[in-house]
From Swiss-Prot:
It comes from Metallosphaera sedula (strain ATCC 51363 / DSM 5348 / JCM 9185 / NBRC 15509 / TH2). Binds 1 pyruvoyl group covalently per subunit. Signal peptide: none annotated. This is Arginine decarboxylase proenzyme. Its EC number is 4.1.1.19. The active site is at residues 76, 81, 96.
Length: 128
C-alpha cells in the first residue's frame, strides 16, 4: 500500500524548484570519499528544510569511476555524481513545495567541495 503525497501552494498549484549544475576541479580525495559525499548530501537535506525518505550511495571503480549519492526526499530528490578521472561532479536538487530551499542545499554542497569553478542553473518546474 502506498501513500499519496500532494504538494500545493496557497494558489492551489504545484511549486517545483530545480537547481542543478556542474562542479569542476574538485579535490580527488573528496570526489572518491563515498562517506563524505553521503554526509554532505544528508546535511544539505537538513539545511534546506527537506524531509528525508532514504539515501543511497554507490562507489564505482574503473577508468571513469566515481561516486553517486541519491537522497530521496518527500519533496523530490538530491543527486550528486562524481567522475574522479575528470575531477568533476554534477549536482541536482529538485523540490516541490514552498517550504524547502534547494538553493541552500546546492550552495552548502558547493562550498563544502570547494570546486575551482562551477555552473549553476535554475528551472521553475511549477504546474502553472
Amino acid at each position: 500500500m502506498s501513500e499519496q503525497v500532494t504538494f500545493q501552494s496557497h494558489e492551489d498549484r504545484i511549486v517545483g524548484k530545480h537547481v542543478f549544475g556542474n562542479l569542476y576541479d574538485i579535490d580527488p580525495e573528496d570526489l572518491n570519499n563515498e562517506q563524505l559525499l553521503k554526509d554532505l548530501v544528508l546535511k544539505a537535506v537538513e539545511i534546506a528544510h527537506m524531509n528525508l525518505v532514504e539515501a543511497k550511495s554507490w562507489s564505482f571503480g574503473g577508468k571513469k569511476g566515481g561516486v553517486s549519492v541519491i537522497a530521496l526526499i518527500e519533496e523530490s530528490h538530491i543527486a550528486l555524481h562524481t567522475w574522479n578521472e575528470y575531477n568533476y561532479a554534477t549536482l541536482d536538487v529538485y523540490t516541490c513545495g514552498e517550504d524547502s530551499d534547494p538553493q541552500a542545499a546546492f550552495k552548502f554542497i558547493v562550498e563544502a567541495l570547494k570546486p575551482r569553478r562551477y555552473q549553476v542553473f535554475f528551472a521553475d518546474r511549477s504546474s502553472s
